[in-house]
Structure formats: C-alpha cells, structure tokens
Amino acid sequence: MKDSNQKRNNQKTLSIVKVLGGLILVCLILFLLYLLFIPKQKESIEEKEKVETNSNVSKENTITYNGKYYQYNEHLSNFLFLGIDSREKTQTSQGQANAGQSDALFVLSWDRVEHSLTMISIPRDTMTQIETFDVSGNSLGMSTDHISLAYAFGDGSTKSCELAKTAVSNLLYQIPIQGYCALNLDGLSLLAKAVGGIPLTVPDDSLEQVDSEFKKGAKVVLDENNIETFVRYRDIEQSQSAIVRLNRQKVFLNAYETCAIKTFNKNPGFISDLYIDLQSYMVTNMGSDQFVKIMEDASSSGVKNSLTIPGEGTEGKAFDEYHVDDEKLYEMILQVFYEETE
C-alpha cells in the first residue's frame, strides 16, 4: 500500500485545460459488450504496504484490515476509460507537449459472475505518483503531480495509455487493470448524433451564465450543438470548478446510458456502427468481437454502483489539487474489489 505520509512534491505545470467526460460512457457501453467473453483473469494483486498498523497483507491475495480478512475477487475484470483533450498543447516542462491529457478518468469493474458493474470516477486534479520523462524520452523517475498529466508524458497513443493505466493502478493500490480505452474530444458530437439527442435535467447553476438554456432544474436535450458546453465547460477562475464539472458529467453519463440502451434495443447495429465511427478518435487494447451479443446482457443490468475517489479539493501553489483520503480510499478498495472471508 502506498505511504499516506509521503510528501506531496508539487511540480509546477501549466496544465489548465477543459475536461472531457462525455466520451467515457460510450466507451463503457461499447466494452460492456466485451467483458463477458474475457477469460477469468489469473492476475494477482501485488502486495500492499501498510496503510496503518492494523492493516497488513498476507499470502494468496488475502489481506487483514481491522481484524477482518479479505480476499481479492478473481471474478472481476477492470477497465480504464480516458477522455483526452488534445486540442491545446499540454504545457509541461518535460514530455510530449502535444500528447494531450487524460482529463476524464473512469474505472469500470465488471463482476463476470454476478453480472454487476461498478464505475469509479477519478478527479483529474488528483495528486498521485506518476512517472515523468525528459524531452528525449528518458525516465526522470516518479514524482507527485496531477494524475491527468500521466498521459501527457507519453506519445498520445499506446504509451500514454499505459502510463495512465499504471498511475491509476498504483493509486488504487495496485488493483489489476486488464484493458484501456481512450477517446479524443473531437468525437463528442458523434455521441449525441448516434442516439438522436440526450434528454436530461440540469443539476446545478454552473452553466447558467454561459447559456441561459442550462438553468438549474431545466429539462434540456443535448445535441450536436450544445453537448460540448454541457460536458466540457468550466470557469477556470473558480476554485474546484473541475469537481463541479465532474458532477455534471455524471448526470450526462446516466442519461446517455439510458439513451444508448433504448437505441440498441431498436437497432442492434447501433453499437457496431458507432464503434466504427469512433475508430479515428479512439486508442484501445481491447477487441470488439461479440459486442452486440454482450450488449443484450448489459442492457438489462447497467451500472449498479457509481463512486468517486474519496478526498478533498484544495488550492495548490499554482493550480487546484485533489488530495485523496487514503484510509477511506483503502476501505473503498476493499468494498469494491475484495470479499470478506473467514
């Protein structure tokens, strides 16, 4: 387990960009189609360091915490979904300035036996250990920075995804992540077009000054013209505006899930058509075989639990930061990924 007392080495990075969240749900829906056909994973969770004196790791993926025993649930398959903003160059002192950032991060955990889904959202300003590189691609080692920058130190493709996957896995106490999917924001309008619009209720007043249509409590339909404002905009002059936006994105995800399932039930070819349309905006190491067959199962279950990494937003020396509550996160990991045993 990571050391909760580790110093936060805040690297000053000019990294204020807009968050992309709307792309994520389509990734989730697409890959629900894949999950049931993935063989039972044999990966073992790595041993964890002590989070406190009453927690320790024993053999065979079994740990003890507060006098109770927990074993990792081998029925789980975990996938990382990233929303990438690459329209603006990522301003880092080292690394690839044009790689973009993973400004929306979600982990989907699928129990292949119970057919249940849990989605964990990770604030883009989460401070955690990431690997950094110089302009020549040489590793500079690990340092604490915004988790969104892990992707930026790669190539904007496979390497970036692997770096982000490693950072997320480490944040979640080395939980195994079997696959990833990253979507660029330029595919955002395709999502609205594919389902013919997304009706939802505006959850807060964060957009009212930008567009009077988005008053708190208003019922609106997101389309190709207004979807970007709803899922991307935030006032960068306001502290913790990324957290406010993340809450708005969750509303979008739930609404899009409903629309996608209805569209699929009317037209089973919807998923495969959308997958093809998104190819030029997507990087993934996951296959697309038998998507439609699995969608039939996923449409009856949906996402059972939706969680956010526990922590607190603070103002850093240069930019907003999200500091994880290590003890609460550890307990959440036990709840989601482990089963209590004798």
Regions found by a protein language model. Give the residues of each.
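Non-catalytic, solvent-exposed segments at the cell envelope interface
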Residues: K2-D3, K12-I16, G22, L30-E342
